[in-house]
């Protein structure tokens, strides 16, 4: 604290030498009033009156013994209770001590596995997907895609032009077998189960294309067209499915499907000349 110059005559008349009257306290009923004097930051003398409420309570023996300890050091002459020069009385904080068993029960309640853990894949709600009220509706995009894929696959299998039997490539129409259009030219690639996906974004990668078509059915080959200089996607790709019905399902499901803020266009791959 800064030292302030006071008149010695005033100090003698007031019967104190530090420029401040002595503190006093008195008890009235259940309240104790403590009056103190001090200098503020502006050098002015201020009077501070603190009020304490006296309450009688039963405390543990350890607390009672601790309160009866003899003060030491610079506080050895202080009166019982807190000293305003060394202790600041703040608001009372209530603490509750619980045992280890109660602590474990509290944590088990907070870590309830049935709360705030489940997340629905359909509507992103806080419940399991099997209990979603929108399951099977238009919001269930996975169910809708599976329905379209199954319908397209069934239509491809029920095509009367297909017998369902295995036909070697050289025996197919236009193949390299006897009587075929390409007899003597060598083996030609089969594009009957290939689809062309266009209107792709420039940031499209092979991993994204794999993620897009892997749920429809197995595929044998993929080709993503890229620019030679920049390496960015040209906007189209080819996917060769293992089965023709999966290719038909891909057209039914992905054609007109929104992906990366663009509407995809999926169609049968045209034979290369």
UniProtKB/Swiss-Prot annotation:
This is Eukaryotic translation initiation factor 3 subunit G-2. The gene is eIF3g2. GO terms for biological process: formation of cytoplasmic translation initiation complex. RNA-binding component of the eukaryotic translation initiation factor 3 (eIF-3) complex, which is involved in protein synthesis of a specialized repertoire of mRNAs and, together with other initiation factors, stimulates binding of mRNA and methionyl-tRNAi to the 40S ribosome. The eIF-3 complex specifically targets and initiates translation of a subset of mRNAs involved in cell proliferation. This subunit can bind 18S rRNA. Keywords: Cytoplasm, Initiation factor, Protein biosynthesis, RNA-binding. Residues 173-183 have a biased composition (Gly residues). It comes from the Eukaryota. Belongs to the eIF-3 subunit G family. InterPro entries: eIF3_g, eIF3g_N, eIF3G_RRM, Nucleotide-bd_a/b_plait_sf, RBD_domain_sf, RRM_dom. GO terms for molecular function: RNA binding; translation initiation factor activity. Residues 165-193 are annotated as: Disordered.
